[in-house]
Design a protein with these regions (language model features):
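PRPP-associated nucleotide enzymes
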Residues: 1-215
Length: 215
């Protein structure tokens, strides 16, 4: 979870923080945050992170991770219990009140954010959409370009994103696009919550991106 209490993001910016602190993985540990309704949640501690990171485990998420045959709608269905329980936790912790869901097409279709918000009685103010595609020059990838954009500005809301982080380039491009959009309109986000299937690469990307956005 990325906090955003001052400006867009909370706390002081420190150039290069993301790259430097990633050397300290040996100090990182999982601390149990809660165990409820069959969902176990652990918080990453000891890494001196800019953001908050949680690892969630539940029977259906373990099935998803360990069974390559799980595809299509079943992927979406497997993520509902853990996503819903995490949103309940965030609501209890006062970390989310009104949600604005950002759907990064097409990966976001695997994440049950709207349904989970409905189950946990979290108001979804609106859903925004972005589509980012690779730009090629002479048969080589030259960058990314936003091909479709339908953004709704909801000041002081929680921006929720569900996306699988591989290289992270799409997420980086879209997050910069959204934060620039809010800045251009003089608006602020309360925080950003990202649900993802990813590893340490995702944490490194988000730490570095947060520091860059603060500069």
């Amino acid at each position: 979870m990325i906090d955003a209490k001052e400006g867009l993001f909370y706390g002081k910016s420190e150039k290069g923080f993301g790259k430097r602190q990633m050397k300290n993985w040996e100090n990182v540990r999982l601390v149990r945050e809660f165990s409820d309704q069959g969902v176990d949640c652990y918080k990453l501690a000891g890494g001196d992170y800019v953001n908050e990171y949680y690892v969630v485990s539940e029977a259906e998420t373990r099935k998803l991770m360990n069974t390559p045959e799980v595809v299509g709608y079943e992927v979406y269905h497997c993520l509902i219990p853990a996503t819903s329980q995490m949103l309940f936790y965030f609501k209890e912790q006062k970390k989310v009140t009104t949600a604005n869901i950002l759907s990064i097409l097409r990966g976001a279709l695997n994440y049950p954010l709207e349904e989970s918000c409905y189950r946990e009685h979290i108001r979804v103010h609106d859903i925004s959409f972005l589509s980012s595609e690779r730009v090629f020059q002479e048969d080589e990838i030259a960058g990314l370009e936003i091909k479709y954009s339908k953004l709704t500005m909801v000041p002081d809301s929680t921006l929720m994103i569900g996306d699988i982080i591989a290289s992270g380039e799409t997420l980086i491009h879209c997050l910069r696009y959204v934060t620039d959009f809010y800045r251009a309109h003089g608006a602020k986000l309360r925080n950003i919550i990202i649900f993802t299937i990813g590893g340490t690469k995702g944490i490194e990307i988000l730490e570095k991106l947060t520091s860059e956005i603060r500069e």
